[in-house]
Amino acid sequence: MRWSLTRPGEEPGTPRDATMTETVKRNLVMGRLQDFVSWGQKNSIWPFNFGLSCCYVEMATAFTSKYDIARFGSEVLRATPREADLIVISGTVFVKMAPIVKYLYDQMLEPRWVISMGSCANSGGMYDIYSVVQGVDSFLPVDVYVPGCPPRPDALLEGLMLLQDSVGTQRRPLSWMVGPQGVERVTPPSLRDAKRDQRRAAQTLRSPDTI
């Protein structure tokens, strides 16, 4: 930070003018209102404290000091869906539980997002039976899929960053009086496809008994 002082009645000189111009350039931010709203939303996603099964343990681990999810502005866990805008479906979704999950989702604030965490939430996992929903996307609009059984907390954080990138590029009306009443959602890229070349080039794999 730079600053300068002038005496009362003193004429500002050229060096001070240059300093003020430089200061204005560093501190004045110009842009569209929608861009600022999207920036604020993507950096202040409030997750709903909700879990279903084993993957919830890994989700809770992501909020510990080791992983420090506060870096992404998502450390504010909400105990009620009316104050949250993100729900992480972490675990097995049974048919009897699906209406309750949908009811909780309907109470969330707009705009709201869904992360499907784990194989059971993504596709039913190993439970190919009548009592388990074969994919939470059959009744909820899923924004990000996090694979694994269960996924590591690092994978959830990577999914959160992927969600933030898509939220930052979404366009939504700021008022019912302005523009169409739809939300232009951006399809998140597939990280499996993005990392394919890097994985193919790997020649040394870590030992399975290490972390």
From Swiss-Prot:
It is a peripheral membrane protein. Its EC number is 7.1.1.-. GO terms for molecular function: 4 iron, 4 sulfur cluster binding; iron ion binding; NADH dehydrogenase (ubiquinone) activity; NADH:ubiquinone reductase (non-electrogenic) activity; quinone binding. Pfam families: Oxidored_q6. Keywords: 4Fe-4S, Cell inner membrane, Cell membrane, Iron, Iron-sulfur, Membrane, Metal-binding, NAD, Quinone, Translocase, Transport, Ubiquinone. It comes from the Bacteria. It is found in: Cell inner membrane. Its cofactor is [4Fe-4S] cluster. It is an enzyme of class 7 (translocase). NDH-1 shuttles electrons from NADH, via FMN and iron-sulfur (Fe-S) centers, to quinones in the respiratory chain. The immediate electron acceptor for the enzyme in this species is believed to be ubiquinone. Couples the redox reaction to proton translocation (for every two electrons transferred, four hydrogen ions are translocated across the cytoplasmic membrane), and thus conserves the redox energy in a proton gradient. NDH-1 is composed of 14 different subunits. Subunits NuoB, C, D, E, F, and G constitute the peripheral sector of the complex. Belongs to the complex I 20 kDa subunit family. This is NADH-quinone oxidoreductase subunit B 1. It comes from Gluconacetobacter diazotrophicus (strain ATCC 49037 / DSM 5601 / CCUG 37298 / CIP 103539 / LMG 7603 / PAl5).
